[in-house]
Amino acid sequence: MSGHSKWATTKHKKAILDSRRAKSFAKLIKNIEVAARMGGPDLAGNPSLELAVTKAKKTSVPADNIDRAIKRGAGLTGEVVDYTEIMYECRGPQGSALLIECLTDNKNRAASEVRLAISRNGGTIADPGSVSYLFSRKGVVTLPKNGLSEDDVLMAVLDAGAEEVKDNGETFEIHSDPKDLQAVRDALKDAGIDYDTDEAEFVPSMEVPLDLDAAKKFMKLVDALEELDDVQNVYSNADLSDEVQAALEAE
């Protein structure tokens, strides 16, 4: 799940099951294949591929798997890689909104599985454009505080195109135009600042607070969507307060 409110930390603290880890690897490999197909196998000349590979390495995808995915995507193995990107829009509990980003080799399968997961878990498929206008595409870098202040981070990345630095409690989140993501990453490296994640994401313009009951339903919906092989990312404008997070973690 990709999100920009503090509720995301709740999911990060859950135990990672082997099945989830395998699904995560498969999705990262798919991203590499698509990036290599679109821009070629050279990381230096293909920023999208470089980002996909960096993310895979941070998630401990084996180097051999990454290398094979690059070659497969670039057509160097004779295999055909043909994925289609699809975005579904969904209304969740208590006025929350979700964008579901899919990467699939079978559009009919993806549509059927996404719709079923939504309908079975209290969501409603929304018309195209009725949810997406609530989000904008941003480059997002998340980093641990490690004793840094918000000003420390902002000064390091301001000239690289950073638009804002958000304080998420345990972490900072840097927003930029997606085209400036590489420059922001480089600026952090030059300043000796470590970061956890970096990618282009859909960021909500406003967040919607959920109470405990709605949060439970929301998490169930997100879990069902993330279990689907064709779903690459789920973005939302849901916000969970510290109290709601604590109640979820206590269950």
From Swiss-Prot:
Q: Which UniProt keywords apply?
A: Cytoplasm, DNA-binding, Transcription, Transcription regulation
Q: Where does this protein reside within or beyond the cell?
A: Cytoplasm
InterPro entries for the chain: Integrase-like_N, TACO1_YebC-like_2nd/3rd_dom, TACO1_YebC_N, Transcrip_reg_TACO1-like, Transcrip_reg_TACO1-like_dom3, YebC-like
The entry's cellular-component GO terms read: cytosol
Segments forming a coiled coil: none
User: What are the GO BP annotations of this UniProt entry?
Assistant: regulation of DNA-templated transcription
Top-rank taxon of the source lineage equals Bacteria
GO MF: DNA binding
- The record's principal subcellular location, in a coarse class, is cytoplasm
The record's similarity note reads:
Belongs to the TACO1 family.
NCBIfam families from the entry? PRK00110.1, PRK12378.1, YebC/PmpR family DNA-binding transcriptional regulator
What is the name listed in the Swiss-Prot or TrEMBL entry for this protein? Probable transcriptional regulatory protein Arth_2304
